């Protein structure tokens, strides 16, 4: 029975994320993610302070500067999130890396007798698995506990800093 439960996607997941922009984070709005079995949807609403700011702008054409929740319809093979947020999600290779890391962490947790967490990852898990410091674009996400996601954990691999990229490129050319 335990094995069968692990293969079923998370039964119900609700997440609320604050969406910020820039290194000196300015609150832009709130994203809501809901999953019920295989069904999932997301909504975004601008924060009132963002809407009142003289330098405000729409994050994308499909998210006009209006009050209230704006729902995004997931296209087949598309993201559940609006395009501005979807652009920060990992690509296919990144998703594979995240899945392998997730499997390795679950295996380690099981060996040490700890809760291994869910077997499958959902859209918000992938969105938040990207390093906050190396995420594409200027959007940053803060979880319900007030922590920017994903903050690098000590002794955990992350995307290499920009300073190391020149060395990595040289090494790849040498191969």
Model features per residue range: what roles?
Residues 1-175:
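Phosphate/dinucleotide-binding and metal-coordinating scaffold of catalytic cores
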């Amino acid at each position: 029975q335990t094995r069968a439960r692990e293969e079923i996607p998370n039964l119900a997941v609700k997440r609320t994320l604050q969406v910020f922009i820039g290194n000196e984070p300015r609150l832009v709005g709130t994203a809501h993610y809901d999953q019920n079995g295989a069904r999932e949807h997301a909504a975004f609403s601008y924060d009132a302070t963002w809407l009142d700011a003289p330098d405000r702008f729409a994050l994308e054409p499909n998210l006009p500067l209006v009050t209230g929740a704006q729902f995004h319809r997931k296209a087949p093979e598309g993201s559940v999130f609006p395009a501005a947020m979807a652009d920060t999600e990992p690509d296919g290779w990144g998703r594979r890396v995240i899945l392998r890391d997730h499997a390795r962490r679950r295996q380690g947790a099981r060996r040490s007798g700890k809760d291994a967490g869910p077997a499958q990852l959902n859209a918000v898990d992938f969105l938040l698995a990207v390093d906050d410091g190396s995420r594409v674009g200027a959007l940053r996400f803060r979880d319900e506990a007030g922590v920017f996601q994903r903050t690098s954990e000590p002794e955990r691999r992350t995307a290499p800093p920009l300073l190391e990229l020149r060395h990595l490129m040289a090494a790849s050319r040498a191969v």
